[in-house]
Curated annotation (Swiss-Prot):
It comes from Aliivibrio fischeri (strain ATCC 700601 / ES114). This is Endoribonuclease YbeY. The lineage of its organism: Bacteria, Pseudomonadati, Pseudomonadota, Gammaproteobacteria, Vibrionales. InterPro entries: MetalPrtase_cat_dom_sf_prd, YbeY, YbeY_CS. Zn(2+) binds at H113, H117, H123. The keyword Transcription does not apply. Pfam families: YbeY.
Length: 153
């Protein structure tokens, strides 16, 4: 089992960001359950870049917590590339405060949530959302964090 992470820090203030070791711990709690090898990029950005990408790819005129861009290999070409996660520092920090969650736990949740998207999970339909949230809760609790959806239940 191996995960190759390309970590890109593209925000002005790096204070308080999770370490590469923490990111790898969270990725290793998720990805190896689905595939033994993976390469992915995590890019931590400011609101401006998140806003631009969210507008361009999702038609939403605001920054968002995490964007997932799965890699789709051409037919017949097998690569371990999972894709890219773009995580907005300010949105994650604001949501942690609003939801009264420890900041590190919310970062972990965004990595788990985004990784599941890269692995093909979605939450557009209610049954898909239920399955994905249940898996996120199980993975988060397995790492010693609380249920990330406890406030909504």
């Amino acid at each position: 089992m191996s995960i190759e992470l390309d970590l890109q820090i593209a925000c002005e203030n790096e204070n308080g960001l999770p370490s590469e070791k923490e990111l790898m711990t969270w990725l290793n709690a998720v990805i190896p359950q689905f595939q033994p090898q993976a390469e992915l990029t995590i890019r931590i950005v400011d609101e401006k870049e998140s806003h631009e990408l969210n507008h361009e790819y999702r038609g939403k005129d605001k920054p968002t917590n995490v964007l997932s861009f799965p890699f789709e290999a051409p037919p017949g070409l097998e690569l371990n590339l999972l894709g890219d996660l773009i995580i907005c520092r300010q949105v994650v920090e604001e949501e942690a405060i609003e939801q009264n969650k420890p900041l590190l736990a919310h970062w972990a949740h965004m990595v788990v949530h985004g990784s599941l998207h890269l692995l093909g999970y979605d939450h557009i339909e209610d049954d898909e959302a239920e399955e994905m949230e249940s898996l996120e809760t199980e993975l988060m609790q397995g790492m010693g964090f609380e249920d990330p959806y406890i406030a909504e239940k």
